[in-house]
């Protein structure tokens, strides 16, 4: 309709100009016609825009319903039982998995983490470290082998109970457009305000929260863009402390933060990991040195396993990776 309107106005102006030169019409009549043409096409353009928006909305709704109607890739077994009162011992037994069935990402991975141990996952980008975490969280099911927690195959327990035992702190923390208090409370929705504040203190987040304009009632922007990355990670640690899981999954941030914030994050993580089984995708040397075990993963296989010092002494793949 915009093109039609433009052409009509152009024709009117040309024809009107020709008629005006011959004193058949006045300039005022021509201007009136141009205004009438604009008024005629304006609602038509509005209808066309509304139709385009409606088509976009229908396409979006179709995609949403496709997601809602899709069968979940991982479903609870009919006789699945809750996972409760666990110590936190984790074992991968000859696990093989690929996001595509003919392209394995992990092959024959075997590892054992005793309750309370810290396991650092080390390896080059794309080696399979994140896949180990995804399988432990049961975002996918293994193709061969099994994963157990305290001897129970995680495919035999309910997903809700499994994930309630897992605390996850990732590099990028998603914060909701809500108060700081409720963002931390997301770790355990039934927690009281006092419990939320206590978790924030343990996470070294209380000091900067109290400096905010409304303290714990300060509104957070979508995705937490009004907080620094270090502050977002401290809030994520507070969430995990509040949830009180037996098993932790940590993906250390690679981006730089100021020295004070990094020290606070490290102190909070040490408190969080105390007495819990922890799997850490490690980037910091301090974390690697403090880990009970290092699992060196390359091309989907655990190729070396041991402590930082023992693997350096072996002068294998980890030694070369560390020196590089």
Sequence positions of predicted segments:
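Helix-loop-helix
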Residues: 1-62
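Surface-exposed charge patches
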Residues: 18, 65, 198-201
């Amino acid at each position: 309709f915009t093109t039609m309107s433009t052409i009509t106005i152009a024709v009117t102006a040309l024809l009107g100009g020709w008629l005006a030169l011959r004193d058949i019409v006045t300039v005022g009549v021509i201007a009136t016609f141009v205004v009438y043409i604009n008024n005629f096409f304006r609602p038509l353009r509005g209808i066309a825009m509304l139709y385009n928006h409606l088509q976009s909305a229908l396409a979006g709704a179709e995609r949403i319903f496709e997601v809602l109607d899709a069968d979940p890739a991982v479903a609870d077994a009919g006789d699945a039982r809750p996972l409760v009162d666990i110590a936190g011992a984790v074992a991968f037994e000859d696990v093989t998995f690929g996001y595509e069935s003919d392209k394995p990402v992990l092959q024959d991975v075997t590892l054992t983490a005793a309750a309370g141990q810290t396991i650092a996952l080390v390896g080059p980008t794309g080696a399979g470290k994140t896949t180990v975490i995804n399988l432990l969280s049961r975002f996918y099911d293994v193709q061969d082998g099994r994963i157990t927690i305290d001897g129970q195959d995680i495919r035999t327990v309910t997903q809700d109970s499994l994930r309630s035992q897992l605390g996850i702190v990732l590099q990028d923390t998603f914060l909701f457009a809500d108060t700081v208090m409720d963002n931390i409370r997301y770790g355990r929705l039934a927690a009281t305000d006092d419990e939320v504040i206590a978790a924030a203190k343990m996470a070294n987040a209380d000091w900067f929260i109290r400096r905010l304009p409304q303290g714990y009632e300060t509104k957070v922007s979508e995705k937490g863009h009004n907080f620094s990355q270090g502050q977002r990670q401290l809030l994520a640690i507070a969430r995990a402390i509040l949830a009180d899981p037996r098993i932790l999954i940590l993906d250390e941030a690679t981006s730089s933060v100021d020295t004070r914030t990094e020290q606070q994050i490290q102190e909070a993580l040490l408190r969080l990991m105390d007495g819990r089984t922890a799997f850490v995708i490690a980037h910091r040397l301090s974390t690697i040195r403090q880990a009970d075990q290092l699992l060196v993963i390359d091309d989907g296989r655990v190729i070396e396993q041991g402590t930082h010092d023992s693997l350096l002494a072996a002068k294998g793949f980890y030694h070369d990776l560390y020196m590089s």
